Regions:
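Cytosolic/stromal cytosol-facing helical appendages immediately following the last transmembrane segment
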Residues: 5, 11-116
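Transmembrane helix interruption/hinge and helix-loop junction motifs
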Residues: 1-3
Length: 116
């Protein structure tokens, strides 16, 4: 029993940190006068995949979560200007575990954002 709990805890922590990494990879908030700029749609990756949002309590609507932290998750909606992950969470988790693939895909997305 104890080994299962330890293993389950380890897997849960890894998944939590992977999702956090995926949602914020490569995105920066400017810091002027010692204060970070206000959070915008360009500071987290969103996902419009309905099945993923249903199964993760709207986890993919990450930008609005940061902009309206007290808003209940069923009321979160997709922001039109929000930047999109190139795939759903399942694919993104696998990609994050394969660094060469992750950097190949995501660094191009970030480079494209810098031209906007």
């Amino acid at each position: 029993g104890l080994i299962f709990v330890i293993f389950h805890s380890f897997v849960s922590i890894i998944l939590l940190e992977l999702v956090n990494y995926i949602q914020h990879y490569g995105l920066e908030r400017k810091k002027e006068n010692g204060r970070y700029e206000r959070f915008t749609d360009l500071h987290s990756w969103n996902s419009r995949h309905i099945s993923a949002n249903w199964s993760t309590f709207n986890l993919g609507l990450h930008a609005e979560h940061h902009q309206s932290a007290s808003k209940p998750y069923p009321l979160l909606s997709q922001e039109e200007k929000a930047i999109e992950m190139p795939a759903n969470y399942s694919i993104m988790l696998i990609m994050a575990l394969i660094p060469p693939l992750w950097f190949f895909v995501m660094d191009r997305k970030i480079d494209n954002l810098k031209t906007i």
